[in-house]
Amino acid sequence: MAQEYTVEQLNHGRKVYDFMRWDYWAFGISGLLLIAAIVIMGVRGFNWGLDFTGGTVIEITLEKPAEIDVMRDALQKAGFEEPMLQNFGSSHDIMVRMPPAEGETGGQVLGSQVLKVINESTNQNAAVKRIEFVGPSVGADLAQTGAMALMAALLSILVYVGFRFEWRLAAGVVIALAHDVIITLGILSLFHIEIDLTIVASLMSVIGYSLNDSIVVSDRIRENFRKIRRGTPYEIFNVSLTQTLHRTLITSGTTLMVILMLYLFGGPVLEGFSLTMLIGVSIGTASSIYVASALALKLGMKREHMLQQKVEKEGADQPSILP
């Protein structure tokens, strides 16, 4: 008669959380969120920023540093819609981005009007350094390039994880990453948050962060499949997730605190980036457990899939952790 064991014995006597017990609930919630995100994106679309729609960029040199918020408020009160201001180079140089102006003459007129408002609001004699018009065609190219970059990243991850681990884990990881990006985009669309190049950068960062979480869990699953001889795949997945839970919570918690500080104190320039990261990291932390891992288990992940493809003598591999 085979010796009975408890799942805690597989984890050296420590408590094991039954994560996989809630896999169908997790799949259901994730599925509803994905459908909702896709519908929202289809109905509301995106609030594309000047990086994608085109616009006028005006570089202005100030006599002395001035508050960005003061100049932005003055421009809005003067009737300019959605002006984007940021320092570049030094505290005396600012860049103003405005919606498209018709032709070169329109850009020059717009530059003069913006300069007048800034001079009046700061009580100084600033000068226009450069005026540049970015056409909609350039913005469309940027949008296409950004989408291709996201797709290339997901494809590269699929190839790497499939080679490094196993295709079932690779499928779970890539689906989880796509899940994170789609839901994040759905939330951005829902709240009509402006999509610019910093948002694309934050989405790439979310993919990288979520991938790191999933790789850590996948590596522990592979290690435990080789070390733990008596556990079922269900038990080994739960043991692996329990063992990496502390690391996941600490890493995600500290990361979210830093991003929250960026959101609260980073100003309008970093607001979209930090908000996207807050949403994506939160979703990615959950998906690394309840999408990537649970999906790999549902795809039939077994011990033999993780072991080296060679004939080994019984007991020649790492010894069981059970007596």
From Swiss-Prot:
TM region positions: 23-43, 143-163, 171-191, 197-217, 248-270, 281-301
Keyword Transport: yes
Gene, per the UniProt record: secF
Impact reported for residue 213 to M: Abolishes protein translocation
Keywords assigned: Cell inner membrane, Cell membrane, Membrane, Protein transport, Translocation, Transmembrane, Transmembrane helix, Transport
Segments on the Cytoplasmic face: 1-22, 164-170, 218-247, 302-323
Name used for this protein in its record: Protein translocase subunit SecF
Family annotation (InterPro entries): SecD/SecF_arch_bac, SecD/SecF_bac, SecD/SecF_CS, SecD_SecF_C, SecD_SecF_C_bact, SecF_bac
Gene knockout outcome: Disruption of both secD and SecF confers cold-sensitive growth (strain secD1(Cs)).
One cellular component term from this protein's GO annotations in UniProt: cell envelope Sec protein transport complex
